Every structure is written in structure tokens, then in C-alpha cells.
Amino acid sequence: MSSSRPAVVPKRRVLQTTRLVNALLFALAVAAVPAAAQQRGDGADEATQTLDQINVTGTHLRRVDAETASPVVVIDRQRIEDSGQNTLGQLLQRLPMMAGFQTGPALNSNFSHGRALVSLRNLGPERTLVLVNGHRMAGPASSVASAPGVDVNAIPAAMVERVEVLTDGASSVYGSDAIGGVVNVILKDTYDGFAATADYAQSTHGDANRRTLGLEWGKTWDRGGLIVGLSQNSMNPVFNRDRSYAAKAVEYLDGQVSEVRGANTRAFLTDGRVLTPVDGVAPGPVGEEAFRPYNRATDSYNVYDAQYLITPIKRTNASLHGSFDFTPIVQGYMDVFWTRSKTVSRLDAYGLEMPDAVDNYYNPFGDQLDAYYLRSPQANTRVYTSTMFQTNVVAGVRGRVDGTSWQWDAAAGYARYKDTLVRTGFSITSALNNAVGASFLDSDGVVKCGAPGAVIVGCTPINVFNPSDPATIAALRGTQRPVDLIDESQMRFVDISANGDLFKLPAGRVQAAVGLVYRTNKFAQGTTSDVAAADADGNCDYNDGCILKQGREESVREAYAELLVPLLKDVPFANVLNLNLGSRYSNYDAWGNTTNSKVAIEWRPIANLLVRATGSQVFRAPALGDLYGSPYNSVIDNTGDFQDPCTGFTGAPNPACANVPNDGSFTNTAQFNVVTSGANNVGFKLKPERGRSYNVGLVYDPDQVRGLSLNVDSWRVVLDDMLTGVGYQQVVSDCFDGSEAAFCPLIQRDATGQLTRVSVPFAYNSGKVDIRGYDAGIHYTLADTAWGTFATGLDATFFSSYRFAGDPHNYVGENSSWGNMPRWRAVANLAWDNGPWHASWNARYLGRTVNGSQYENFCVDTNADGSCAYFPIGSVVYHDASLSRKIASLHSTLAVGIDNLGDRKPPRFYSYSNAANTEASTYDTLGRYVWSRLRVEF
């Protein structure tokens, strides 16, 4: 299906026998009769106007006007090609209305898996709905393997016709998740011929080599058409050490810039000495002389040395679009795309605490050994290999009611996302603990695990006190096992919709759209490895996390209706005045139902000035991962940062302090378990997020300057019951102070008041967020001059407010725990066409921000006096350019381009960084990048 075909329009629909559904069907049947009569009586001119109607993202109605009450930014095919990108992620993330945590290939340490997520209004990828030809894509249902949100890099960019970005809440139109807005990717639906495309790119540092090969074939017949695409692309990695700003992890501590280094192998003795192995020790058992005093300056290691700055990736895309006209008014269609991607993330070797090493046979220190930490880069470098599959299939039939304006569409679809993350460099916990723990020399002269009379069968002791011994390295590897972690989501849906004219008013025809949707969402998690399979509390025998084998499913039934009522036309001060109403009912068997509606006004006081206003209700349903995600367990002792609010308790009975004496004598001294899991797993009830979205703006196309268009919009999103993460400290504290009574059943204490367990849901409804700002754009096209055609544009977003209920602070202009939010973001572009030549220039502006938030005490860096240090980050401008020429004699197009012309380095964020000492989801980490592309058509 492609929404670029005017005859039929794909929409969101539903299948449920309810009063609302019956009412919609009755309205559709009744409305079609007068509409048909009116169409027959109005003549051929009216029919021709109907054919000119198109669908616009943000409404189910077909419109003649491209500009409606919904603010939509369009990225056309030429702009995609000018970017030089072979995926959509970076292009979309650079739009000024995108902000906040947007995962991309530059986030190695956050395990992006090569995915690219988009976040409108800094509301998070989970609150930006991504559609392909008007239909939802599937993404991970939980954050166990990767961050939630749809991977826009999985969409085959070579087959994209355009991208429409709706910057307004649209739950009344599309349902859940459309809070910040909607990204609707429209795929090509027609092409005649065969084309081959080759792309190569490389940074001027000589790395990040990118290669793309693509094939495209299409054929159009009298009654249909077919277009098929296949592409493969890959990109080499870039290490942190390959960029000066990222070569070492740095912090600003006590007024000085210092390197953050990791500790190597160390032995802590009871007399206070800290020792480390000397180099060049012969294989075999060692004595105390094989160790020397540990010097942090020389014996520590660079934590960034082995880490990727840009993760390597290989991706294969295949796509198909086909259509067939069964009759002049009925058409069948199918859209399929499939993506496979493979990425690798690397982290340095981690240190292993050996609590029982004092009883190891090879211990040269005897009882003097207090603690031993082993770090083996040869054995414990961590590698994460992710293989992802994304499949989307939609098939349907659409048509029109002959002699009327009514069109209908019936479609069924399937979407699947699967991510298999294989972890290497980690040990089976019991195997490692047994091998490095207690051991002895048996009477047969063989060193064995355990103790005399209690030998651990199948275990060979490891001499961890000679970590460079090849036998030690091999033995450590022998305790390891590659373990997979599988996260899969599936979605099946049936959509039925219709739209057309109801009746005629003096100002024009009243249009309606109705639809029904039935959808099932399913997610599954698990592993093929028995050692990583978790029990109900998240425990397993693997030292890099466990996962519960499980599957869950929910069904969704929805119905919607939308009306466009023309109120005035061709009267003084009202060339056009339209009222747009819409409502959508959604029923989730997992938690209940909700109805979300919108009211929009389109007013043209004169023909070339549009004043628009929209008020919409929005919502987001809790994801299945939020409800049922796999648990994980941790043990907390009284030496950490946890502060029990019941310490010294003397007040009235408090549910957080069950069994705690109130005489002021209590102190929690016991270790306790923290089980973090899906909310339903721990008996915690989640509510959907609900809110409102507002937009007021104008679009002006002055007659005095042909080709000029100006727009400005004021927007606001108010979100109640926002789902956010929570920690065990907050669970206990919020129960104690009464701010969240629902947390109290999650706290368990023994008969003496000592904590035994705290259950923590993945998410909870934290409260209200209120976000406000402005969008503005200026676009001008100067066509058919002696020097060619010029087109220029500027789009900008101004964040004015990002606040939470009960919190007076404005987080805009800060890099805080809510993300990096420059107040200004803008993109300017200039394009030139003259015959076979085309050139483009693009500038990206990121406004000033502050490193850290003084208000929320988000303090990591410190001044000499110990006070928090906050650094102003200046504005950054990136310039990109491209040039292409069509060579008619060779049926080809050659294009070259440069991104980040000035080789601008990202600003330094010290300890506030999410990767490589900077904010990688905001700034360019690669540097100057040169690309070329050749397309040949046959």
C-alpha cells in the first residue's frame, strides 16, 4: 500500500462488535446513500475534484489542501539523496523537532545494536509513533536486549519516496504512542526499469568505511505494477582511541581534568598493602615475590582503549510493492519489507572479585590475603553480537463506491521484530567460583577443587595468581559460555476503513472517515542457554544477567471516526473556515479502555493565510515489557549508598517500617534482595499515560513573492501519569513519606524489621510533565532563472519549557537526567538545479546548553572546593554539501558529498557523557565524512 495513490487511502481500522462499532457501521451505511445521490447530481466537475484529493498524515480524511490543521514536515526523495545516508536514522535525528536520548550506532556502550531511534519533543522514542505507509512497525517490547522504540534504520532507505513528520499529538487518529507526534515513511509504489546503485564513504581520518550495493526493478502494467528492491550495506568500526577527544575517559574532579582509569589485578593484604603481579613471570605457581606494590598511576588501564566509538554493522534489506486492479474501482495491493542487521559492541575486560581466593591452593599469601581482584584482558574482554530481523507484511483490497466519493480499504498485516544478543567473555558463575575458590593438593598429587572428602567433581582449580600464564587464560575461558538473549515482538492486525462525503452545506461538503482495527501484540523473551535462564526472582548461574523464558500477548480493539465540517466559505474574513473533529476508542485486554478525541480549526481569513489550532487527547499504553518484563536480582548490603528511612525510627506505625521498633534504636544491618521486574510480576498496577496536545499556528504564502512560504506554530504537550523508571531507594522512601502508597506492598522485612526483599517495577506512573515550545519555517523557491532553479529553507525549534508537576525548575538549556536540551535547534538548506546538475548545502545548528543541572543536583564534576561544577556548552554548527550530475548517455547519476565540512569535534561533557566524553545522541562523533554514489539505470 502507498498513500501516494489518490484513488484509495490506507488507514487505521478495527474489528469489534460494540455499540460504538455498530454506530459507526450504521453511520457509514446511511451516509453513503445521500452522498451517492449528491455525487450523481453534481456532475463531472465535482468528480474530478474528488480525484485530486490526497491523504495527509495526521488525518484519515482525503484533502485537496496539502496544508491542514496538522503541522507536517515533509522530507522528499531529493533531500534523502542529498544527505548521502543509506539509512534514515541520522537524517531524521537531525530534524530540529527531535531531541533527547536518541540511540544510534555511535552509542556503543548503550548497546544500540545499530538501531536508530527518534524522539519528538524529547518525549522519548516510545512516545513517537513510527508508521510505514500508514501502518505500525514492531519494535522491542522491553528494554532487556535493547532500548524500546522502533528502529528507523530497518526501513530500506533506497525504497523510500518521502517521510512525513507530524509534530502534533495524534492518538485520536492513530492510537497509542502518538504523543510527541508521528513519523510516517512512504515507500515508492511505481518504477519502470532496472537500476543498480553503489555507494562508498570514508572519514578523512581514514576509517568508518561504508559500502552500499543496491538493486531496484519495477514494471507498470495497465492493471497494476510491481517494484522490488534489494540492498546491502556495511560500515567499519571506529575505536575511541581513533579520535583525540575520545581516546581517554576524562572527568573534572576537584577543579582538575583527570583521566578515569580502570584498576588491574590487585591483591589486598591484611597489613594494608596492595600488590599487583609483576610482568614476565614464568608459567606455573608463584610466590609472593611475583608481586610488587600497586601503583594506580602506572598499573591502571585506559577504559576506552578497546571500546568502539562507532559500532560495525552489516545490514541487508529487501522490499516489494505490488498492486493489481481487479476492476476499474477495486484494487489489491501488497507491501513487504525485510531487514537483517548484525552489529558488534565491545567493552573492556571487567574485574572479577574472588571472595574465596584465600582458600585457593595457589594463593602465595596464605591468611594474609584479605581480597583479590582479577582482570584478564586476554580472557574477559566483553563482546556483544546482535543479530536483528525486522519483517513487515501488509496485504489488502481497496476501492471506491461507484458514482460516489466514498472509498474503502480492508487490509491485514503482520510485523515482527527479533533481536538475538550473544554475549561472550562471561563465565558460568558456579564454574568460576568453584575453580578459583577452595582447592587442595590431594594424596594422588593432583590439585583438586573443594576440600578433602568434599571434592567438587568436574572442576579444575585455576591459578588466578599468575594471570598471564597461558594455562590460566585457557582455564578462565573454559568457565565461559557464549549465551544468547532473545527479545521478540510480533504484531498482527486487521484494518477496515472508509471515507467520503456525507452531505453538502453552504460552505462545502461534510466529509467523514470511519474505521475499525483489531490488533494483537505479542512478545517473547528467553535464551537457549540453561545457565542464563532465570527463575521467577531473576536468579541464574551466569555472571552477566539472566532472562526469564516467557511469552505474553494482548489484543487491542479500536474504532474511530473523523469529521470535517466546512462552516464558512468565501465570506468577508473567512475565505475558508473548517471544523475537524475526531475520536478513537481503544480497548486493551491487558488493562482496560480509553477514548481520545480531538478538535481542530482551519481558518483562512484570506486564501493564502492559514490559521490553525488543534487540541487533542493523547495516551500511551504500558508496553508488554513494562508489565511482564524478565526479572533480575541484586543483593544490597549496608555499605552502599542505600539509606533506610526507618533508621532511628521513633514515629507512629509506618507501612515502610513493618516490625521496626519505634524507640530510635533500629539500624538495618542485613543484606537484602532487590528484584526488578515487570510491574504485573511484582503485583504493581500500571496505568496508561494520558495527556493533552495543543498546537496553534499559521502558514502564509504571500502573493507578492511567489514561491515563498512562512509558518510558525506554538505547541504544548501535557502528559499525566508519565511512565518512568524507579529504583529500590525510591520505593522504600516514597512509601515511608506517603507520596506513593502503592510501593508499600513491595517492601518485605523480617520479624526484627531487617529488610529481606524490595521488589521494583520496571516503570511506574510518576506524574505530570509539561513541555512547550515553538516551531518556525521559511521556505522559498526561485524557479526557472537563467542560472537554474534555487530552493532554500530554514526550519527551527525553540524549546521554552520542560517542567514537572510540583517542580518549579525549567530543564530546557541543560544536559540533565532528562537529556540534553539546547533551547534552539535549526536546519537550513539550499538546493540548486540546472539541467543535469544538482547541488545542495545544509547547515545544522545546535544551541547553547549547560553541562549538568544545578537544580536537581545532577552533579558529577566538582570544583577545587568540592562544589558542583557546571560547564556552559557553546552552540555548534555543522555544514554538509553535495553535488550530483545526471549523465544521460550512460543512463546514470553520479553524486559526491561531504558531511561536517569543518571537521567539527563534539564538545566535551566530562563525566556527564553517555559515550566518549560527549553527548553522542546530540553531536557528530565521526568528523568530516566524504561519500560518493553512482546510480545506473537500464
PLM feature segments, named:
Residues 190-193, 206, 222-223, 327-330, ...:
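Short loop/turn motifs that connect adjacent beta-strands in outer-membrane beta-barrel proteins
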Residues 112, 117-167, 195-198, 513, ...:
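Periplasmic plug
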Residues 1-95, 214, 218, 328, ...:
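N-terminal Sec signal peptide and the immediately downstream disordered periplasmic leader
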Residues 6, 117, 428-430, 616, ...:
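C-terminal beta-signal and terminal closure region of outer-membrane beta-barrel proteins
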Residues 579, 709-854:
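Gram-negative outer-membrane beta-barrel transporters
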Residues 142-145, 236-253, 275-313, 319, ...:
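Surface-exposed, low-complexity loop segments enriched in small/polar and acidic residues
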Residues 2, 720, 800-801, 843-859, ...:
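C-terminal beta-signal and adjacent terminal beta-strands/loops
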Residues 40-46, 55-111, 132, 137-143, ...:
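N-terminal plug
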